Structures are given as structure tokens and as C-alpha cells.
């Protein structure tokens, strides 16, 4: 007897739901799945160059690139790598990450990270991005400010007035000529663990645009008072600054100039490291203004190796297996098979890798499509033959290069 696709997923595939994203876009949701084992070398390289480079190498900036021979430079996992590195840091104020990078125990420092991204709607400049980073620190799954407040309150002997004074003293120590700490921000933080997040949620879009740097500066003062020595800011979608029509040429130059300001003035110069995502289109659009402001080079040439990490996508089938398993494992039920990629069979891995050109985001989207197709067809397992038939019928395989090393040879006949 035929069942609906979702019942088939539950009972035949052993999955409570389709775990894969229905769009090839990183959502940033707390439930987004991640495994360091998908890109172990790139993950280690990124954290080494950004974190250890920021702590011990004197680096203030770093760049996470994606590149592919086809010229398709999105969907490689830059956003996910940044987000999950920030989460790994904030889990224990960077202790485990630093230990894994080989930093000696005596040199491990308390650090935090924030993630924020530009967009073409409300964050098309640096200040609203800094505001979003402050929100990232204050609320949600990556929040550190509630724990920071508890630490400061303990140091102040549960005296809120003393905690207030400690934060003000921190400002005078690290940036005596810097921006003043906003009183509304300080009051909200001192008042309760959730006070800062609640305050920030009510700030108008206009104020975020004008005053985002003030809120972020205040966060740095608060973190410094608690003994945090470095903040790692991960900025995604920098290419939106250079998109045609997003900003006028004058405004784009101003926004890029603000990045330079943050490398030179306190409290940012000594307490902040910024990482940016890049690809070829972003580099072309931003190069002129970037160079005019004499910002650190984002070039991928060997001379700049200490500041640049390049993601080149999924190169091996074991990476595809690890990626699929990371997403499926949380939703497996008592009907699940013993294979880590069940209901897929191993010959599907190469097909998905070739079809996506190694781009993790695209691969997960195609896996979602294929899983639903298998459930709709009521198959017991999803093998290579089913995958080839499905994708050929939708015209996807025609775009895959026949020379792809492993999977391409299996279905050259479909590429004619």
C-alpha cells in the first residue's frame, strides 16, 4: 500500500523529516548542522590564520575566499565556517579552540567572537553590521553577554554600582579618548542578563545606521572589563558593498574607509580582529576603493598566505558522506538503516558531488530534492541508478562536466 512521501521517510528511510535545506542558502539557524570533519584541513587553516594569527601574529584582518574552476564561487561553506567558528569560540571563551590550535596553556587568552553579514536591505554599510554584531553578542544561541554580566557581577561582589564603575574604568584604560559609552546601553546591561538584548531589539533602523559603531564600541568596553582580550568579528557578504546599485560610489568609498578607521583607532586597533568573506566578483568590485584606502591586501597570492584561506569545495566522496551524515543523524529514528548515509547508497555520493561542483550548499539542496523524490517513488533505498534517472529527467546532469574524475565516468552517456 502506497503512503505519502513523509510517512515513507519516517518508516522506510528512518528519518523523522527531510533534514536537508530546501534552498541552497545558509540560514544561520541554531539547528543548522555542522561537522568539522567535512573540511578538516580548511577549518583548521581558517582558525589557525584568523585566531592564532590575531593573537600571536599581529594580524588585524583576514580573508576567507571561495574559488572554483567554473567561476561559481558561492555555496562553498564560507558562511557556515564563520558562524560555527564563532560558536566554537563563544562556547568557552575560546579555550578549546586555542588549545586545538597548539597554543600553550599559559598563553590561552579569553576571547569572544561575533558574526554579522551585510545585505542589500538594512545592512548595506559598516555601522548597521556592527550593530548586528552587538546583537549577536547579546542575544540568541551565540550570546556571551549574559555570562559576561554574571562574571562582572561576581567580581563586583553583587554590587551593580561597582559593576557600572568597573566598566567605566575599562573605557578609560583602553580608549581614554575614544567614544563615550552610551548610558542607555550601560543601564540595560547592568540591570539584567537579558537587558542588553531587549534594549537592542527596540533600536530603530535609523539609529542602527547612524549609531551602530557606538553600540559595538560599548560592547568592547564591557568585554574588556570582564577580561576579554580580543574580539573576533566575522563579516559575511562583503561583496554587497560593491554590487551595482547597492551604494553610490561615494558611499562605498566612505564605508570602506570606515574599515580602515577601525584598524587605527582604539578600542578597535588593539582589541579587534576582522575576517571577511571574498570571491572573485567581490574582489573586482571592491579593489579600487580597497587599495585607495591602503587596507591590508586580500589577494590570494603566496605573499599574502598568512591572511588568506581559500575554500575549493568538496573534493572527495568521504567529505560528502560526512556532510550528509551530519544533517541526517539528528533526525534518525528507530527505522533507520545502519549506514551513515542511509537511505542513500555510496554510489550516490559522487553524483551529488559532481552535480553540485563540490559546493556544499548546492549539494545539500540537491540531496533534499533527491530524498523527496525517493520518498515519493516509495523506493527502499536511493541508489546511483535512481539518482541518475532523477537528475537526467530534470536536465541537471547536462551541466556536469564529463571529465569529473570519479562520478562523471559513471554516467557519460547522460551528458551527451
Residue positions per predicted region:
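P-loop NTPase nucleotide-binding core
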Residues: 56-228, 360, 398-412
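Short beta-alpha junction loops
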Residues: 67-71, 114-120, 278-282, 367-371, ...
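Charge-rich, solvent-exposed alpha-helical interaction surfaces
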Residues: 8, 129, 147, 151, ...
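C-terminal alpha-helical "lid" subdomain
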Residues: 4, 317-416
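The catalytic "switch" region of P-loop NTPases
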Residues: 1-18, 44, 199-348
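Active-site-proximal structural scaffolding
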Residues: 78, 252-255, 356, 363
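Hydrophobic, Leu/Ile/Phe/Ala-enriched alpha-helical segments that form helix-helix packing faces
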Residues: 46-55, 85-93, 133-137, 219-226, ...
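A short, basic N-terminal segment
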Residues: 1-63, 88, 95-96, 103, ...
Amino acid at each position: 500500500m502506497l503512503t505519502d512521501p513523509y510517512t515513507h521517510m519516517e518508516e522506510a528511510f528512518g528519518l523523522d523529516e527531510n533534514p536537508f535545506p530546501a534552498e541552497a542558502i545558509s540560514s544561520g539557524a541554531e539547528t543548522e548542522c555542522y561537522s568539522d570533519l567535512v573540511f578538516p584541513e580548511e577549518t583548521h587553516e581558517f582558525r589557525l590564520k584568523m585566531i592564532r594569527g590575531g593573537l600571536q601574529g599581529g594580524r588585524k584582518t583576514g580573508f576567507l575566499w571561495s574559488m572554483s574552476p567554473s567561476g561559481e564561487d558561492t555555496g562553498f561553506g564560507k558562511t557556515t565556517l564563520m558562524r560555527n567558528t564563532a560558536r566554537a569560540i563563544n562556547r568557552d571563551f575560546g579555550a578549546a579552540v586555542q588549545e586545538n590550535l597548539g597554543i600553550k596553556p599559559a598563553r590561552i587568552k579569553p576571547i569572544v567572537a561575533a558574526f554579522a553579514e551585510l545585505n542589500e536591505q538594512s545592512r548595506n554599510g559598516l555601522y548597521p553590521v556592527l550593530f548586528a554584531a552587538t546583537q549577536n553578542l547579546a542575544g540568541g544561541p551565540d550570546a556571551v553577554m549574559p555570562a559576561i554580566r554574571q562574571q562582572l557581577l561576581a567580581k563586583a561582589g553583587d554590587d551593580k554600582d561597582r559593576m557600572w564603575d568597573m566598566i567605566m574604568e575599562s573605557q578609560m584604560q583602553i580608549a581614554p579618548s575614544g567614544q563615550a559609552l552610551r548610558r542607555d546601553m550601560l543601564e540595560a546591561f547592568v540591570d539584567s542578563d537579558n537587558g542588553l538584548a531587549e534594549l537592542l531589539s527596540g533600536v530603530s533602523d535609523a539609529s542602527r545606521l547612524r549609531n551602530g559603531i557606538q553600540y559595538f564600541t560599548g560592547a568592547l568596553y564591557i568585554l574588556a572589563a570582564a577580561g576579554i582580550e580580543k574580539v573576533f568579528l566575522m563579516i559575511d557578504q562583503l561583496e554587497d558593498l560593491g554590487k551595482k546599485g547597492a551604494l553610490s560610489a561615494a558611499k562605498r568609498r566612505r564605508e570602506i574607509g570606515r574599515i580602515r578607521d577601525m584598524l587605527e583607532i582604539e578600542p578597535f586597533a588593539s582589541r579587534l580582529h576582522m575576517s571577511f568573506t571574498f570571491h572573485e566578483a567581490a574582489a573586482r568590485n571592491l579593489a579600487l576603493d580597497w587599495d585607495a584606502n591602503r587596507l591590508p591586501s586580500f589577494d590570494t597570492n603566496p605573499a599574502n598566505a598568512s591572511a588568506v584561506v581559500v575554500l575549493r569545495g568538496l573534493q572527495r566522496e568521504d567529505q560528502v558522506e560526512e556532510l550528509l551524515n551530519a544533517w541526517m543523524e539528528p533526525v534518525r529514528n528507530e527505522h533507520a538503516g545502519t549506514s551513515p548515509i542511509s537511505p542513500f547508497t555510496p554510489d550516490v555520493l559522487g553524483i551529488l558531488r559532481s552535480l553540485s561542483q563540490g559546493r556544499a550548499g548546492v549539494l545539500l539542496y540537491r540531496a533534499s530534492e533527491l530524498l523527496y523524490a525517493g520518498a515519493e517513488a516509495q523506493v527502499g533505498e536511493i541508489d546511483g541508478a535512481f539518482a541518475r534517472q532523477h537528475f537526467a529527467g530534470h536536465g541537471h546532469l547536462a551541466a556536469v562536466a564529463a571529465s569529473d574524475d570519479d562520478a562523471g565516468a559513471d554516467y557519460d552517456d547522460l551528458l551527451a
